[in-house]
Regions:
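Short acidic-glycine-tyrosine-enriched beta hairpin
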Residues: 43-57
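All-alpha amphipathic helical-bundle segments outside canonical DNA-binding/catalytic cores
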Residues: 126-143
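Regular secondary-structure segments
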Residues: 33, 116-130, 177, 181-184, ...
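Short, conserved beta-strand element in jelly-roll/cupin
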Residues: 23-39, 55
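A hydrophobic/aromatic-rich effector-binding and dimerization subdomain
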Residues: 1-16, 58-128, 145-159
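Basic/polar phosphate-binding segments, predominantly the helix-turn-helix DNA-binding elements
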Residues: 150, 175, 179-226, 233-237
């Protein structure tokens, strides 16, 4: 896999919406600087507030839906594991996964300036990159992850923490999403799942979109495409 390091800081108005869930073959560190959003990741939806960082693993489906604030500000870093190889070597890959994968890190106010300083260095370096820049990216990114371990309370993105993390996620929608994740390769219809959950199909359709920010059919197709892409990457299967 090709080496990758990208960093971006952007401000959105309240009308902005991500069109669809997506995944990629590299890691992403997502920092919500201002505003609030619902973060769909893997097969659950979580509430994120300003000052929270989420570590998104490679090949994991995710999507943000911003809530009704005046504006939202977010920063993300996309990177491959060669930029954090020293940290992985020290922790071991399994410990690294347990520490970071799909974890939410809440940055304490008294340490926020340290994180912002690192982000500022990385943004400036990316805008004025040269032959030495990869060394700067690697050193500061690993330092950033170390600070997350040392200073931040974190919660794994799991069903056990779901109630604490997002208040609007409806149990019936979570059950539907879990069912799709397990049965995406079968014929599935909205009416079938609504009946399984003892819900009116129209009500279920509206609830599904309200929780996730995208419709039932879009979610089902995205899950199928994501699994197909992973099969192509990880096996000798072809599309023919």
């Amino acid at each position: 896999m090709a080496s990758r390091f990208e960093i971006s800081q952007q401000i959105y108005n309240s009308a902005y919406a991500m069109h669809s869930a997506h995944s990629h073959s590299y890691y992403e560190l997502y920092y919500l600087m201002n505003g609030s959003c619902n973060m769909f990741i893997h097969d659950n939806t979580y509430r994120m507030e300003a000052g929270t960082i989420l570590f998104i693993p490679d090949n994991v489906l995710h999507k943000t839906t911003y809530l009704n604030n005046a504006y939202h500000e977010r920063l993300y870093i996309e990177f491959t594991d060669d930029y954090i190889s020293d940290l992985i070597d020290i922790l071991g890959f399994e410990q690294f996964k347990d520490t970071f994968y799909m974890h939410f890190f809440s940055i304490p106010d008294n340490h926020r300036h340290e994180f912002l300083s690192i982000f500022s260095v990385l943004i400036n370096e990316r805008q004025n990159s040269n032959a030495l820049s990869p060394c700067v990216y690697k050193n500061h990114l690993q330092n950033l992850l170390i600070l997350l371990c040392r200073y931040c309370d974190n919660k794994p993105a799991s069903p056990a923490s779901l109630v604490d993390t997002v208040s609007i996620a409806d149990v019936s929608v979570q059950k539907a999403m879990n069912y799709i994740m397990l049965n995406y390769n079968k014929d599935i219809t909205l009416d079938e799942i609504a009946d399984m959950l003892h819900l009116n199909p129209s009500y279920f359709s509206k609830k599904f979109k309200a929780v996730n920010g995208f419709g039932f059919k879009e979610y089902l197709n995205t899950i199928r495409i994501n699994h197909s892409e992973q099969l192509l990457l990880e096996t000798d299967m072809s599309i023919t």
